[in-house]
């Protein structure tokens, strides 16, 4: 993805100073009581501090990010050591261990932290990744959304274990969508779950193109998406614009489906334009 600058001159300086004020406010508050995940937890906040410290060349902010990271790892490991029922483990991307693992991998890959942090959750990786399979095997698919965050965590790893679990996930999901009763249950999933699964499958296809049936699943979920009742909210409109880019970049997607996606977006744009 190529980033384009959207703020210039005074507005750019104002935006920069505002972000710095946010970082300073975070440093001045005790956030240990919060969840530890990526979207709504301390690993996401830690990433923000690392990025701000690098951008502003502020070692103090970076050290605060490192301290927050060390604290949340210590707390998470303590919870894992005392946990008796791993079915109670929060494996979500937003607040749980999948988001923590993804965040640590991001910091490692971008050289914010040393290799001593690698393999932090090695002992629990199999438990986390297995959950990605079990949620697909559950009769009612009530927790299918959990597979998205775990899958993103698995993709962020460069291990044979994670690739094997992603392969099993694709195989299980492919087998289930072929069943009439199961496909109806998947179609009844939330809009965000369908969007999340499409994006996850696309990322799997890019990183591991040798995993069979991934493209078939992407196309199947695109069909589900095209039949989904759409709202004209700004949030959904933004998601639709993102998906249109995916449609246009994938020549193997059916032409009729592609045209329908464009039609939906054009009509939603007309309806929603005052909200933008």
Put a short name on every predicted segment:
Residues 1-276:
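Glycan-recognition and catalytic cores of secretory/periplasmic carbohydrate-active enzymes
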